[in-house]
From Swiss-Prot:
Segments for region (Disordered): 1-99, 161-311
Compartment annotation: Nucleus
Keyword Nucleus: yes
Keywords: Nucleus
One GO BP: nucleosome assembly
Species whose genome carries this gene: Pongo abelii (Sumatran orangutan)
Official protein name in the record: Nucleosome assembly protein 1-like 3
Pfam families: NAP
Start-end of Acidic residues biased regions: 161-182
Listed Basic and acidic residues bias regions: 200-229, 235-246, 254-300
InterPro entries: NAP-like_sf, NAP_family
GO terms for cellular component: nucleus
Recorded family membership: Belongs to the nucleosome assembly protein (NAP) family.
N-terminal signal peptide: none
């Protein structure tokens, strides 16, 4: 009996598995479903005929077979509803895309690809060009180094300039234009090799012409002498004709005698005006009240007892004033930054050596101070010097790719980049003081820029900080280091950067 029951249970299970396999291999027409239903009915009849021996076992077998057939049919229906039709052959093809180049004929696309390869070669030439510019900057920075050293010595009272060095170089207090320089240069240039022999021959001819010119002058004088000879003849005829002319002639002779008297009067007039002016000045001095004179005497007596003010050494607060007058750096400098920046003695610019990645570094030199232990604070800007296929306008100029700062070794309680706040918590019923460190706005945040992640993007706030940081590096590189004196005097105003703010296209690109 046990063997018969096992056979009765196993047969409908096998039929159910067969039905599932048939349902999975059916087509969209649904003919296989009909065959599966007919097979299930035959299996039900066979199972009922085989179990006619015992009533209890036959009842259990029929119930199991009917439940198995019902479950498989419901599964096949659900599977049929969820089935997705296969894509057609046209849909299986790779999409051409909506790009303009993808819609071109294959022959034209091949030619465009050849042009792209040529453009890659042009970008390689541009990299060499930018590296050559960097080498030129490094070369001329060495020529400027002795001039920067003299500037450093004057600012820090290590050298006192002479009177000649303190005088303005130009006579008209304006730089001469290029045309004026070109007009003056030929006179200073030595003669060329081919012109040395010709010049001596031309000089005697010029001298001969110069000698001939004064010979003509005496001829003119002879003509002038002949004119007065004719005048007495006319006068003689007039005397013979009438006596009235005789009376008129002596009056003409008297005029030359009066001429020297008129000249003497003209000479005496400026002397008289000068004497009047001097007298007016003397009267003005006499009109000064006696009280003012006494006040001036009292001030002189008071100053005798006080020591004279000593002249400041060097140029105090030079770089502080320079940085405050820079368009982007000025708003960054807070009041608590100014006492620290008064110890700033020099700002220099150094370029990377040949063979190294293209970059330049700013060095901020500080005198010993009670705020931090660093003598030099460094900020390095790395320049993009390799072509990028994502940037088609690589050759437009320098582009800052990344920047690196340095760690400031602050003394205890002197860090101005953070503020410490104390918050009291009363959760346990006791008063506890927990210090919290909060970032603070400061110029010295310039030396700790946000790092650019290798993967992903920066936050919008950090991205804006980097953009502004790169602009500051550009301004320091182009103008401030080379022409710091114009920032100190305030001759460079804010409108200067409205036209050259994005000079060189040095902008951070995501």
């Amino acid at each position: 009996m046990a063997e018969a029951d096992f056979k009765m249970v196993s047969e409908p299970v096998a039929h159910g598995v067969a039905e599932e396999e048939m349902a999975s291999s059916t087509s969209d027409s649904g003919e296989e479903s009909d065959s599966s239903s007919s097979s299930s009915s035959t299996s039900g009849s066979s199972s009922s005929s085989s179990t006619s021996g015992s009533s209890s076992s036959s009842g259990s077998g029929s119930s199991s077979s009917s439940s198995g057939s019902g479950s498989t049919s419901s599964r096949s229906r659900l599977y049929r509803k969820k089935r997705v039709p296969e894509p057609s052959r046209r849909a299986r093809r790779a999409p051409l895309g909506t790009n303009f180049v993808d819609r071109l004929p294959q022959a034209v696309r091949n030619r465009v690809q050849a042009l792209r390869n040529i453009q890659d070669e042009c970008d390689k030439v541009d990299t060499l060009f930018l590296k050559a510019i960097h080498d030129l900057e490094r070369k001329y920075a060495e020529l400027n180094k002795p001039l920067y050293d003299r500037r450093f010595q004057i600012i820090n009272a290590e050298y006192e300039p002479t009177e000649e060095e303190c005088e303005w170089n130009s006579e008209d207090e304006e730089f001469s234009s290029d045309e004026e320089v070109q007009d003056n240069t030929p006179s200073e240039m030595p003669p060329l090799e081919g012109e040395e022999e010709e010049n001596p021959k031309e000089n005697p001819e010029v001298k001969a012409e110069e000698k001939e010119v004064p010979k003509e002058i005496p001829e003119v004088k002879d003509e002038e002498k002949e004119v007065p000879k004719e005048i007495p003849q006319v006068k003689a005829e007039e005397k013979a004709d009438s006596k009235d002319c005789m009376e008129a002639t002596p009056e003409v002779n008297e005029d030359p005698k009066e001429a020297p008297q008129v000249k003497a009067d003209d000479k005496e007039q400026p002397k008289a005006t000068e004497a009047k002016a001097r007298a007016a000045v003397r009267e003005a001095h006499k009109r000064v009240p006696e009280e003012r004179l006494q006040d001036s005497v009292d001030l002189k007596r008071a100053r005798k007892g006080k020591p004279k003010r000593e002249d400041p050494k060097g140029i105090p607060d030079y770089w502080l004033i320079v940085l405050k007058n820079v368009d982007k750096l000025g708003p960054m400098i807070q009041k608590y930054d100014e006492p620290i920046l008064k110890f700033l003695s020099d700002v220099s610019l150094k370029f990377s050596k040949p063979g190294q990645p293209v970059s330049y570094t700013f060095e901020f030199h500080f005198l010993p101070n009670p705020y931090f232990r660093n003598e030099v604070l460094v900020k390095t800007y790395i320049i993009k010097s390799k072509p990028d296929h994502n940037d088609p306008f690589f050759s437009w100029g320098w582009e800052i790719e990344d920047c690196e700062g340095c760690k400031i070794d602050w003394r205890r309680g002197k860090d101005v980049t953070v503020t410490t706040t104390q918050s009291r918590t009363t959760a346990t019923g006791e008063i506890e003081i927990q210090p919290r460190v909060v970032p603070n706005a400061s110029f010295f945040n310039f030396f700790s820029p946000p790092e650019i992640p290798m993967i992903g993007k920066l936050e919008p706030r950090e991205d804006a900080i980097l953009d502004e940081d790169f602009e500051i590096g550009q301004i320091l590189h182009d103008n401030v280091i080379l022409k710091s004196v114009y920032y100190y005097t305030g001759e460079v105003n804010g409108t200067y950067y409205q036209f050259g703010k994005h000079y060189g296209n040095k902008k951070y690109r995501k």
